[in-house]
Amino acid sequence: MTLEEGLPSADLIVLATPVDTIPLLTVKILNRIAPHQVVMDTGSIKGELCEVVAMHARRGRFVATHPMWGTEYSGPDAASRGAFAGRTAVICERERSDRDAVETVERLYGALGMPLVSMEPEEHDLHTAYVSHISHVTSFALALTVLEKEREEQHIF
């Protein structure tokens, strides 16, 4: 089924594609939806996306979200039952979305057992960057510490 074939029968359209595809895909879908339809995304970057849709005539039908759950794995094999329960979902620019659209998304996340928080896109992106990169920063700092200690001891691997 193509996007054009499936879109008319959907009440809620969930975008869960690679983050670099979401802004243009969101615009493409907003251009085609009916007034009752809701579009939401699940991408990890919100700043660019929210800028791209800011002036769209159907901006109110879009809810920018990010379920804060994931592993190093992706695809269907990475799925696990109950994975979202107790994990936070972020809604960005809640006030720019129509009330009924936000309520639809809240019901979905509520059914998954996910508490909700609201953030501005820039705040979300900053916090997500911290969380996503903390393991890399920690590993790098540890490696530098070990190398410095080895230099002090004049033993370098």
Predicted regions and their residues:
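Glycine-rich nucleotide phosphate-binding loop and flanking beta-alpha elements
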Residues: 20-21, 46, 69, 97
